[in-house]
Amino acid sequence: MSDMHSLLIAAILGVVEGLTEFLPVSSTGHMIIVGHLLGFEGDTAKTFEVVIQLGSILAVVVMFWRRLFGLIGIHFGRPLQREGESKGRLTLIHILLGMIPAVVLGLVFHDTIKSLFNPINVMYTLVVGGLLLIAAECLKPKEPRAPGLDDMTYRQAFMIGCFQCLALWPGFSRSGATISGGMLMGVSRYAASEFSFLLAVPMMMGATVLDLYKSWSFLTAADIPMFAVGFVTAFVVALIAIKTFLQLIKRISFIPFAIYRFVVAAAVYVVFF
């Protein structure tokens, strides 16, 4: 593979990762389809995907840095809450409660989860995750009990963490599981999305570092330019995607995302079966 060809592949996959990582559409499903079509598969490809995920995570840190610092008691400038909202109550405890279920199950069943990473499982989870998004829109309370992040209770945070366990099934979409769970627990669509992003930082960072440690032997000096292009591309595109997504969900429901998941599931079937 020529240098220019590999850099082009890195840029394409970086765009795919950045666009889909935090949307409820399954970045895994998109990555396996695009990677297969580009002929970029195997151990190096898996390590590459781990590295560019760090770019997406960094985008969340940049977007929510004030809120992230606030979780540990460090505040900059004006308070985060707007007029009429409750005083800042989202704490590190909410994040920890949201992490515990998936961390425990993820560590216990890590090898089993990795064995589920194949096109047929991803196809099924795309469909199931789409159905969950539809259920969340149809069954959510008419008036959210937690319209803002700072209105969330510890119980809601923990239950969102339980829903996040669904994302251990490859292809389900971590954001899709957590946002749907939040809405079903009475958290507004916007606040559930914000909490999903905040929860992604420690969850994805931990999982990515663990995977990178296990995949380190497949990384060579010759791969660094390709990995760097993918990382930077994923970071920039994820920044744009997060900003756009948060504006979009103020105006539309998640039904279009659910339908899109069904289309991607059909694409997986066509490409691999």
From Swiss-Prot:
Q: What is its main location?
A: membrane
One annotated GO molecular function:
undecaprenyl-diphosphatase activity
Which is a Pfam family this sequence falls into? BacA
Instruction: Write out the catalysed reaction.
Output: di-trans,octa-cis-undecaprenyl diphosphate + H2O = di-trans,octa-cis-undecaprenyl phosphate + phosphate + H(+)
TM segment ranges: 6-26, 45-65, 90-110, 116-136, 190-210, 222-242, 252-272
Enumerate the Gene Ontology biological process terms: cell wall organization; peptidoglycan biosynthetic process; regulation of cell shape; response to antibiotic
Write down the membrane topology.
Multi-pass membrane protein
Q: Where in the cell is it found?
A: Cell inner membrane
Going by the UniProt record, its keywords in alphabetical order are: Antibiotic resistance, Cell inner membrane, Cell membrane, Cell shape, Cell wall biogenesis/degradation, Hydrolase, Membrane, Peptidoglycan synthesis, Transmembrane, Transmembrane helix
E.C. designation(s): 3.6.1.27
- Other remarks in the entry: Bacitracin is thought to be involved in the inhibition of peptidoglycan synthesis by sequestering undecaprenyl diphosphate, thereby reducing the pool of lipid carrier available.
Q: Which PANTHER family match?
A: UNDECAPRENYL-DIPHOSPHATASE (PTHR30622:SF3)
Stated role: Catalyzes the dephosphorylation of undecaprenyl diphosphate (UPP). Confers resistance to bacitracin.
Q: What is this protein called?
A: Undecaprenyl-diphosphatase
